[in-house]
Structure formats: C-alpha cells, structure tokens
From Swiss-Prot:
Keywords: Disulfide bond, Mitochondrion, Oxidoreductase, Protein transport, Redox-active center, Translocation, Transport. The gene is chchd4. Residues 115-124 have a biased composition (Basic and acidic residues). Its main location: mitochondrion. Disulfide bonds join C53-C55, C64-C97, C74-C87. It is found in: Mitochondrion intermembrane space. GO terms for biological process: mitochondrial disulfide relay system; mitochondrial respiratory chain complex assembly. Pfam families: CHCH. This is Mitochondrial intermembrane space import and assembly protein 40. Residues 61-105 form the CHCH domain. PANTHER family: COILED-COIL-HELIX-COILED-COIL-HELIX DOMAIN CONTAINING 4.
Length: 139
C-alpha cells in the first residue's frame, strides 16, 4: 500500500514494489533559459556574468566587489591571445584593495606560513618528547 507523509518541509512517499515498477506518468517541464528568477551558473545564457552566482563566494559584493567585478569582467571578455593579459591594471587594483582587508581576504602565503610554523613547533615538541623518552629509557 502506497502512502505519503509530510515531515516539515519534506514530503516522504512510500511506494510498493508494484508502484515502483510502473512507469512514471509525471510530466517534466523544461526550464526556461530566459526566466530571470531561475538559478543559473556563473555565465548566463546570454553570455553575461551572473554576479549573484554562489560560486563567486560573495567576492562581487564584498568591500572590493567593484574591483573584483572589473578584473573578472576584463578577463571574461578579454580577446587577447593570452587571455586576461590586458587586465593587469584591474587585477592590481583588486589585489591592492584586498590587501587593505586581510581579515576578509586572507593572503594564501600568510595562511601557508602560519600552518608551516605550527607544524614546525609541533615537530619540535614531538622530537623533544621523543629524545626525553630515549634518555629516560637509557638511564
């Protein structure tokens, strides 16, 4: 016996083996690529950049959003043989802006150095413990 149960926002449908083996009669409606309310990826069907795409991680709306949009647009629309090679000024402006907000835009080098420093301290502590243990066992 098939039945349906609502749990909060979820609808749970239990079906029998026979129901599951019967071909579905559900009609799928094709997405309208021109629907302005439909979710799209980074590039919209018309070729424009979707600044609301979650894939940008909020970069387009942060304190350096305008610089990011300028650099990203330049790169996206670049016709140079080496794509984006004509966008150096925009990327420099974006980088300079991001350096003003290190809490929002941490530098990868800073993170890498901090992680390496932490690992070195842990390794030193471990080697000190190991040598102390060896000295105790040899006594």
């Amino acid at each position: 016996m098939s039945y349906c149960r609502q749990e909060g926002k979820d609808k749970i449908i239990f079906v029998t083996k026979e129901d599951h083996e019967t071909p579905s009669s559900a009609e799928l409606i094709a997405d309208d690529p021109n629907d302005p309310y439909e979710d799209h990826g980074l590039i919209l069907p018309n070729g424009d950049i979707n600044w609301n795409c979650p894939c940008l991680g909020g970069m387009a709306s942060g304190p350096c959003g305008e610089q990011f949009k300028s650099a990203f647009s330049c790169f996206h629309y670049s016709q140079e043989e080496i794509k984006g090679s004509d966008c150096l000024d925009q990327f420099r402006a974006m980088q300079e802006c991001m350096q003003k907000y290190p809490d929002i835009y941490p530098q990868e080098d800073d993170e890498d150095e901090a992680e390496k420093e932490k690992q070195n301290k842990e390794a030193e502590a471990f080697s000190t413990e190991t040598s102390d243990t060896k000295e105790e066992s040899s006594s």
